[in-house]
Structure formats: structure tokens, C-alpha cells
Amino acid sequence: MSYEQQTSVESSVTLPELLRKMTELGGSDLHLSTNSAPQVRVHGHLAPLPGFANMSPSDTKRLAYSVLTDAQKHRFEENLELDFSFGLKGMSRFRANIFNQKGAVGAVFRAIPYEIKTFEALGLPTVVSDMCKKPRGLVLVTGPTGSGKSTTLASMIDKINIDRHDHILTIEDPIEFLHNHKNCIVNQREVAADTHSFGAALRTALRQDPDIVLVGEMRDLETIEMALRIAETGHLTFATLHTNSAYSTINRIIDVFPAEQQAQVRTQLSLVLEGIMCQSLLPKSSGDGRCMALEILIPNAAIRNLIREDKIHQIYSMMQTGQDKFGMQTFNQALATLYHKRQITLEVAMQRSSNADELRELIDRGSGLNESYGGGGGGGGRPATRPTQPASGGSPYAQGRPIGERPPVR
């Protein structure tokens, strides 16, 4: 087929058709790029949609522009990139990023279910539910891109919306999960649509009488400083960061500030921090989805002192021994638990661990295991590198990039 014939085939395709194909395949992301067929991410792996030819620059631009308002088109052409979200009735909501590459338009669309998953469906432990009951303080959900942070936060906000009678204010870029008023009033503000920036929204947030504030992402010094201040003034504040461990999250927050302010910030953080959840998605041993490994830090008096005294490196040992009493667990303890519950293979556990020797010792001893921690799926019994009866059922987390060979898209 000639290039002209290929592009003429593509010109009849609509974006809703491609998104429907993606959702039918159980995909999480749709990628549009010139000189490539549309590609979807299924169980964390990219593969071309079967039956579609390579797209031309005019194809990708037409598809991307088909869901933009005039204001969004203007903003994209001015800034050369755009984050936004939208919904397709009867299908799903989608978060999108449109960008320029080599002079042509590219786009990525991520599926966001209308349904918000429950704690039980996500396999979140009881200690996470306790964080939602806090009257004030800072709760952080961290992890790499595509680790399901938005899914976890949406579940936590929904639980608060059901259990409490408060005002929830969210500041997001863009709005992902939609929250209806239940027992709480929920106001969701989108950067560039409802406010100019995270900083601008946070500066006026306290005038809007919130009880709970969600900051979509703490990207810079101003946002971090404002989030700490809001938590300090008696509001329960949720936020995300792209960090890979609990103690690196603390360091990231402190290191953003100038050296002369860091002692003050350590004291401030030691007082307001109520929890850090650092999560990662792993391929399930059954091959039909992913499960979540979750590191949890709950600041007790000793940990608050370590933060204040700049002894962050000692926090890890406190987490290792704080599981039974405080509900904490390290990432290695989470991996060992998932392995013993036959949800992941030994190979995956070792590949994802930053300290394989410690993990091997945990697995061999059978210690440090959290029986209340589900990781987003079922399973149980004695461990096996290749379980004969693996846990079944796909993960409710739609994102992630697991290790393994790329499966074909059927």
C-alpha cells in the first residue's frame, strides 16, 4: 500500500473510534504519532492497534484537534503543548497531553474510569483509611509516572466524601476523576480553565472555607510552601510527588527550599506530616494485569524527631520495625508480602527491589509480612516462583509499565 493510500485510509478514522478500540482491549493509553499506526498500552506494554496504517501529520493534528475547544487550540498553538481532560458519553473520561514533535502534532490519551474504585477493590490497607479520618495535616501519595497515584487519591477523596460532612477543594491539572456531592461539598478547580496556576489557586484557597484540600501535584517551591502552610493552618491536605520512597519524599520537599530555610521547613514538616504512601505497579504472576506494592510511612514521635533533627537516613530502620504497631511497611516488605501471597514472581520482586539482599532475607525468613495488605488482588498460600494457581482478575489500576516481554494486541 502506498503512503498516499495509507493516509487516505487514516483520514476516515475518528478519535472516538480509536478510544473505543483502546477501551475494548482493556488499554490504558492511546498514542498518536506521525509515521506510526495508533498504539495502545495494554497491561503496561505498547503495541500497534491492528488494522490501522501509519498516520500522516495531518491525521494526527485532525484527531487531536477534534476534541479541543477554540480556547484550547489557541493555548496549544501558543505554548506548543497542552494538558486537558474530557469525557465521551457511554465510554470513559480521558486525560490528554498534546505536544509538538519534529514539527508535527503528537498526542497521548489516558483512560480515566467514571467509576471510582473502593479501598477494597484497590487492596488498600486499613492504615490508609485512618489517614482519611485525620482532621488536619499533610498526606502524600507518591510514585513514578503511571503508578496509579490519581486512582488511589480519587478513592481516598471519595471515602471522605461519603464518611464526612466537609468542604473538599481540589486543584488539578487537569481534572481527572469527577466527584459528585455526597455528604461533602466538592469543588474541583482545573489549572488554566478555572484558575491561572496551582500557586494562584492555593493563595486564595483558605478564603473558600475548605476542610480538605487536594493539590494535584507539588511541582515547585511555591506549591510545596503553600501546601505546607494550608496543612499547618488546620486543613487536611493531600498532594502527589514523583518520588520513589518515603524518605526520598521528605528529602525532596526539604531540598526544594534555600539552605537558610531548610531547618524551619524540617520543623514545619515534622509537625504537619500525617502519612506518605509510595506506590508502584508490578506485573501479576498470572499475567493478566498488575498489582500494587505500597510503601507506607506513618510519622510517630520518633520519626517526627528524626525529621526535625535532619536524620532522615534513620527513618528506614524505623519503618522496618513499625509495621505491627503503626501500620508502616517498607517497599521490600510489600514485595515480600506480594510474593508470599503468590501475586508476583520472585524474578519481578528482585528486579524491583533496591536492596535485593534484604528482600531475599525477608522472603527466606518469612518475616516482615503484612497479612492485611492485599496489593490490589487476591491470593494466598505458600510462595512459588511460578505459582500453579496464581491470583486472577485484572488490576483496577490502569497504568504502569511492568517488566516482561511485550504481548501482542489481539
Task: Cite the ranges covered by each PLM segment.
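Short, flexible helix-loop junctions that flank or precede catalytic/ligand sites
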Residues: 1-410
